[in-house]
Amino acid sequence: MAEKLKVELVTPYKKVLSEEVDEITATGALGEFGVLPGHAPFLTSLKIGELAYRKDGVSHHMALNWGYFEVENDTVTVLVETAEKADEIDLERAKAALGRAEVELKALTPEDKNFRIYEAALERALIRVQVAGKATRR
């Protein structure tokens, strides 16, 4: 059994992460899950949420948009629409997006064609605000 997981995280635009990590957690379609070295092969879809990993005793956090997460032979492949590291998120911009999405949603009903668009924008902004507030910890 390997002692580390090899993680490759990519978006359609760039490779965001290529690291060997001790453990990783993410938000799947059915809830949060974690992966350690030696995990069985696994494939799931991801929803808007947080990805966290530990490397050498330090926690790192990222905000993710929808995508896929695969584990095979101690290699984790993550393909997502967008990914932002906690220290790269502009907190004021994320808070402004959260406020705009809240205002738009209040004016809509679930039957409106744009309701789901603003609901997803609200989810993204909320995750970005939460992740931006997490400092790297030992």
UniProtKB/Swiss-Prot annotation:
What keywords appear on the UniProt entry?
ATP synthesis, Cell inner membrane, Cell membrane, CF(1), Hydrogen ion transport, Ion transport, Membrane, Transport
Q: What is its main location?
A: membrane
Kindly list the residue ranges recorded as spanning the membrane: none
Fetch the Gene3D superfamilies from UniProt. Answer: ATP synthase delta/epsilon subunit, C-terminal domain, F0F1 ATP synthase delta/epsilon subunit, N-terminal
In the UniProt record, does the keyword Zinc occur?
A: no
Task: Output a single Gene Ontology CC term carried by this record.
Answer: plasma membrane
Could you tell me which Pfam families the record lists for this protein?
Answer: ATP-synt_DE, ATP-synt_DE_N
Q: Which GO terms describe its molecular function?
A: ATP binding; proton-transporting ATP synthase activity, rotational mechanism
- Compartment(s) of residence: Cell inner membrane
In its keyword annotation, does this UniProt entry include Cell membrane?
A: yes
The topology of this chain with respect to the membrane is: Peripheral membrane protein
Which family is annotated? Belongs to the ATPase epsilon chain family.
Function text: Produces ATP from ADP in the presence of a proton gradient across the membrane.
UniProt subunit comment: F-type ATPases have 2 components, CF(1) - the catalytic core - and CF(0) - the membrane proton channel. CF(1) has five subunits: alpha(3), beta(3), gamma(1), delta(1), epsilon(1). CF(0) has three main subunits: a, b and c.
Know the name of this protein? ATP synthase epsilon chain
Lineage, uppermost ranks: Bacteria, Pseudomonadati, Thermodesulfobacteriota, Desulfuromonadia, Geobacterales
Gene, per the UniProt record: atpC
